[in-house]
Amino acid sequence: LASITASGFAVLYMDKLNALVGRYRGEAHEDEMVGYYPLCAFGENRVAASIDTALHAFLPFPHVDHLHPDWAIALAASANGRQKLDEFNKKYGRRIVWVPWQRPGFELALMLRKAVEATPGCDGIVLGGHGLFTWGGTQQDAYVTSIKTIDQMGEFVQDHEKRAGRPL
């Protein structure tokens, strides 16, 4: 990312991307959705949009971080990850939501949107077996939330290992 310029990013109209929800025919037709992304392109921009485009776009926040830090993966991939996330939230006063593993794509994007809508005030999402989403009103807010979350998850995992004598 240090060397990429604006021309290297896919730029899409949000209203067109959101309109694709009406075209979505369900999980069995997941793969066809990526074919619609070029129809949402802004101007002459023809940079291919990522399979994860909708994951970021459907979250109602100005800045979204999608991360795969080791500490979050330790939590997300543990056999009892949802339970451990509940413990984490209680310990740190957080409201991070668990979304079970789902293949990346449109269905997962809709699951994330629904999770946020169903949990007003949530401050992150752990994707089971996958990673972490955090956000903020500005780039700086998103960054600070991401670092804070990763640091807290690291502390949580290490504390658990010390207490239990084994990893999560």
For the regions a protein language model found, what residue spans apply to each?
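Glycine-rich flexible loops
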Residues: L1-L168
